[in-house]
Every structure is written in structure tokens, then in C-alpha cells.
């Protein structure tokens, strides 16, 4: 997927380095049961106020099926970011199917707290 193929509505788009860090953290949060997979589950975590950040796939077809999430994230003050591939996001989530959105959730005493805060700061720098 080249720069021209990416829908301009998929903003902010993570670069290759941030994408790798994001997908690694998504994979770890799946192991720690801190991950919700799918657009509907991500919406639920936002509404319940238990989302740390949202990761969405820029190649979702049509992209409009997940474009309600950035609006909800802005309302709830939750960082969000797009990655290029729904296939890669699906693999990181530990499922064999493509995943177009996922949410890393809040958990008391989580061992991933430092990594989550680091990623949140990286995402917020993209939004500026």
C-alpha cells in the first residue's frame, strides 16, 4: 500500500516504526486480556470509558464504517491512530481474520502501563 493508496480521511497514520511498536503492544495487551477487537467492541469501550487508545486500519473498506470512532475518541479525549493494514492488525490481535479496529483497555495494576503511556504520547504527538 503506497502513500497514494491511503485514504486521506485516515489521519493520523502511524509511520513504520510506530506501527511496529503499536502492533507489538496490541499483541502483548491481547496476552494480558486488555484488548477488545472490532469496531463495535471499540465503540463499547469508549462509551464505558475504559479505553486507553484506539487503533484502526486505514485499508478498511469502506473506511466510513469506522469513521465514527475518531469523533467518539475526540469527545472522550482518548488517543487514536490508524495503521496501514487490517491483516497485520488482525495478526497482532491474535485472530486469523482481518481486524479494522481494536481498543487497548484500562486495567488496574497492569504491567503494560509504561508502554501504554509511551504509545499514548507518541500518538498525541502525531495529532499536533
Curated annotation (Swiss-Prot):
Gene3D superfamilies referenced in this protein's UniProt entry, alphabetically: 3.30.1330.30
Any one GO cellular component localisation term in the record: box C/D methylation guide snoRNP complex
Superkingdom of origin organism: Eukaryota
Name used for this protein in its record: NHP2-like protein 1
GO BP: any one term: maturation of SSU-rRNA
Quaternary structure and interacting proteins, as annotated: Identified in the spliceosome B complex. Component of the U4/U6-U5 tri-snRNP complex composed of the U4, U6 and U5 snRNAs and at least PRPF3, PRPF4, PRPF6, PRPF8, PRPF31, SNRNP200, TXNL4A, WDR57, SNRNP40, DDX23, CD2BP2, PPIH, NHP2L1, EFTUD2, SART1 and USP39. Interacts with RAD17 and PRPF31. The complex formed by SNU13 and PRPF31 binds U4 snRNA. The complex formed by SNU13 and PRPF31 also binds U4atac snRNA, a characteristic component of specific, less abundant spliceosomal complexes.
ATP-binding among keywords: no
Recorded name of the encoding gene: SNU13
The organism of origin for this protein: Homo sapiens
Segments of this protein annotated with the region Important for U4 snRNA-binding: 96-128
Subcellular location: Nucleus; Nucleus, Nucleolus
Keyword set, alphabetical order: Acetylation, mRNA processing, mRNA splicing, Nucleus, Phosphoprotein, Ribonucleoprotein, RNA-binding, Spliceosome
Coiled coil: none
Positions where N-acetylthreonine occurs in the chain: 2
Amino acid at each position: 500500500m503506497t502513500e497514494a493508496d491511503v485514504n486521506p480521511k485516515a489521519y493520523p497514520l502511524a509511520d513504520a516504526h510506530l506501527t511496529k511498536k503499536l502492533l507489538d503492544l496490541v499483541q502483548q495487551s491481547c496476552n494480558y486480556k486488555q484488548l477488545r477487537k472490532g469496531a463495535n467492541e471499540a465503540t463499547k469501550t469508549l462509551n464505558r470509558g475504559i479505553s486507553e487508545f484506539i487503533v484502526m486500519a486505514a485499508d478498511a473498506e469502506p473506511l466510513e464504517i469506522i469513521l465514527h470512532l475518531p469523533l467518539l475518541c475526540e469527545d472522550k479525549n482518548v488517543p487514536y491512530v490508524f495503521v496501514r493494514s487490517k491483516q497485520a492488525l488482525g495478526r497482532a490481535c491474535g485472530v486469523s481474520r482481518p481486524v479494522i479496529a481494536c481498543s487497548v483497555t484500562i486495567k488496574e495494576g497492569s504491567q503494560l502501563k509504561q508502554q501504554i503511556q509511551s504509545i499514548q504520547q507518541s500518538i498525541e504527538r502525531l495529532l499536533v
